[in-house]
Amino acid sequence: MKPNIHPDNYRTVLFFDSSANEGWMIRSCAETHGKTMVWTDGKEYPLFSLDTSSASHPVYTGKQRNVNTEGRASKFNQRFQSVMSSFRKDK
């Protein structure tokens, strides 16, 4: 490996998803702004907080909600059903 190709701040960083209460340690250059956390091995590591990860994202966990299961045509029919019925009565 070539010397001096990695940035100076390339180190082991703890990525922690607080919503899933899970963390991962990997080598990274991510800016942690001085935040640290003690990991399960008893050592203190720079901490990068995550809002969402594969442990908490609905697509990965399978806990997603089906907001809309109807198609466009049925939505259109529901929206304009009253207009269409009054139009048919006028004839």
Swiss-Prot record:
Top-rank taxon: Bacteria
Cross-referenced Pfam families: Ribosomal_L31
The keyword Ribonucleoprotein belongs to this UniProt entry's keyword annotation: yes
A cellular-component GO term for this protein: ribonucleoprotein complex
GO biological process, one term: translation
Keyword Metal-binding: no
One term of GO molecular function: structural constituent of ribosome
InterPro entries from the UniProt entry: Ribosomal_bL28/bL31-like_sf, Ribosomal_bL31, Ribosomal_bL31_B, Ribosomal_bL31_sf
Keyword terms: Ribonucleoprotein, Ribosomal protein
Entry-linked PANTHER family: 50S RIBOSOMAL PROTEIN L31, CHLOROPLASTIC (PTHR33280), LARGE RIBOSOMAL SUBUNIT PROTEIN BL31C (PTHR33280:SF1)
Subunit structure: Part of the 50S ribosomal subunit.
HAMAP family from the UniProt entry: Ribosomal_bL31_2 (MF_00502)
Family: Belongs to the bacterial ribosomal protein bL31 family. Type B subfamily.
The name this protein goes by in its record: Large ribosomal subunit protein bL31B
Organism encoding this protein: Neisseria meningitidis serogroup C (strain 053442)
Upper taxonomic lineage: Bacteria, Pseudomonadati, Pseudomonadota, Betaproteobacteria, Neisseriales
Chain's gene name: rpmE2
